[in-house]
Swiss-Prot record:
Residues 190-238 form a coiled coil. The gene is PHB2. It comes from Bos taurus (Bovine). The lineage of its organism: Eukaryota, Metazoa, Chordata, Craniata, Vertebrata. The modification N6-acetyllysine is found at K147, K200, K250, K262. The mitochondrial prohibitin complex consists of two subunits (PHB1 and PHB2), assembled into a membrane-associated ring-shaped supercomplex of approximately 1 mDa. Interacts with ESR1, HDAC1 and HDAC5. Interacts with ZNF703. Interacts with STOML2. Interacts with ARFGEF3. Interacts with SPHK2. Interacts with COX4I1; the interaction associates PHB2 with COX. Interacts with MAP1LC3B (membrane-bound form LC3-II); the interaction is direct and upon mitochondrial depolarization and proteasome-dependent outer membrane rupture. Interacts with IGFBP6 (via C-terminal domain). Interacts with CLPB. Residues 19-49, 150-174 are annotated as: Necessary for transcriptional repression. This is Prohibitin-2. InterPro entries: Band_7 (IPR001107), Band_7/SPFH_dom_sf (IPR036013), Prohibitin (IPR000163).
Amino acid sequence: MAQNLKDLAGRLPSGPRGMGTALKLLLGAGAVAYGIRESVFTVEGGHRAIFFNRIGGVQQDTILAEGLHFRIPWFQYPIIYDIRARPRKISSPTGSKDLQMVNISLRVLSRPNAMELPSMYQRLGLDYEERVLPSIVNEVLKSVVAKFNASQLITQRAQVSLLIRRELTERAKDFSLILDDVAITELSFSREYTAAVEAKQVAQQEAQRAQFLVEKAKQEQRQKIVQAEGEAEAARMLGEALSKNPGYIKLRKIRAAQNISKTIATSQNRIYLTADNLVLNLQDESFTRGSDSLIKGKK
């Protein structure tokens, strides 16, 4: 390029001697500035660069860090890699151990190994993610999911995720990739299997409900038996008390009459009731005899 500028300056009419010299100096300065610009490049933060040489190819021993660097123009070309971790979601349909179709999705956080960038460029180029991640993720998912039944994939999800991460990390090392995180984001089954699981859950709930009703009926039956035994015992004790003290019935009549009289006295509609209506007939000789016997019994 500088030689072309010099040739162009030589073809220009000489004219006044001072003007030709100034023009040549201007063109020379432009050529020098262009050469300096082509000799300098910058590696941004979170990036690394390697050199491709027109003579020797990729330089295996040169990995450039962030900052300003120099190169030989027209012979060395910098190839810049972004080494920051980037997320990628990959979905894959696969089969479980009990031959159920499973749709599983992973979120993979990956980055290139900065120390192996020259060999990565020779094998995979710059689009290494598209070349590597989908294939190794599908491979590992099919291998791991096939070890578990469909129900185990749900109940042992943490163990499945750990196994997928371990195998996928080891597999990615073969391609100079580092996986910072692997997580299961979605796990679904076919409609038929989902319907079967829901039906099974409904049946289990119905069975549990039926068992609960049976236990409830048994408890109610035991309660009635205990209540009947208590009432029978109370009746027996009452019979013994009456046989020993007949005045107990008279006392109950007096208390009942007192309650009735109090209720009528506080009511707005007052009526006249005889002693017979109050179950308190003081003229009844049997009542008097019962009361006397009750008083004697207390003494």
